[in-house]
C-alpha cells in the first residue's frame, strides 16, 4: 500500500501495479481498492499500464476529513495524478465516472477518459429515485442506520430488488464490507448532483470536457443506464460510445471483457 496526501491533508491510500502510462481506476458506490473485480481489472491492465487503484475518501485505508465536499474528491484525484507524474488516463465506474467527468470539467490533467455507465437519468420514462434521495440517504447515515441506508440506496437509487439486499445480508463478508463504506453513500449522491433524478446534462460540457473519451455501456444493462451512456456520448465533443454485451456493471464486472477494450482505447495513438 502507498499513500498520497490530498490538498486538505487527507491521506489517500492506493495500490500501484504494472509498468507503462499511468492509469487511475475510480470506483463507484460501495467500491474500494480491495473490491475483487477492481483488483482483477487492475491486474489485467497492469500488462500495459502503471495502474493506480485507490480508496476513495472515507473508504478502506483512506482518511475522511470533514466536512465532505465534491471538490475534495476532485482534489484527491488531482493528488494521485500529480503522484503519477502530472497526467494520467482515468477510468471511472458509475458514480466514479461522475467524479472523473467532474474532475475533467475542472481542468484536472486527464489525458484520456473512460466513463463506464454513469447513472444519470436522461429520459422522463426512465426510473428515477425519490426527489429527496440525497437528503434521505444523508439522514439515514446521520441517524447511525447504515443498514437502512444501504437498502434505501440500493433499492431506491440503484433499482435493486429488496430480496437481493436481503441475500447480501446473509453472505459472509459481503454485508460487513458494505457496512464499512455505507457512510460514503451521501458522497456518491452528492457527486451525481441531481443527474440521477433527471437534471439535464449541461451543454457546457461541450466546451469544458474536450479530452478523448470512451463512454461504455453493456447491451444487457437497464435502459436508463444505456440512455445515459448514449446521451453523454452525444454531449461530449470528443467522445465515442462502446456498446457491447458483457460490459455492464449492475451484476458483476466482466473484467476479461472490459480490460482489452480499455487497453485498445488508452493505447490508441499512444
PLM features: residue spans?
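Active-site loop/oxyanion-hole signature of alpha/beta-hydrolase fold enzymes
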Residues: 43, 52-89, 260
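Helix-rich cap/lid subdomain of alpha/beta-hydrolase
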Residues: 118, 122-175, 188-189
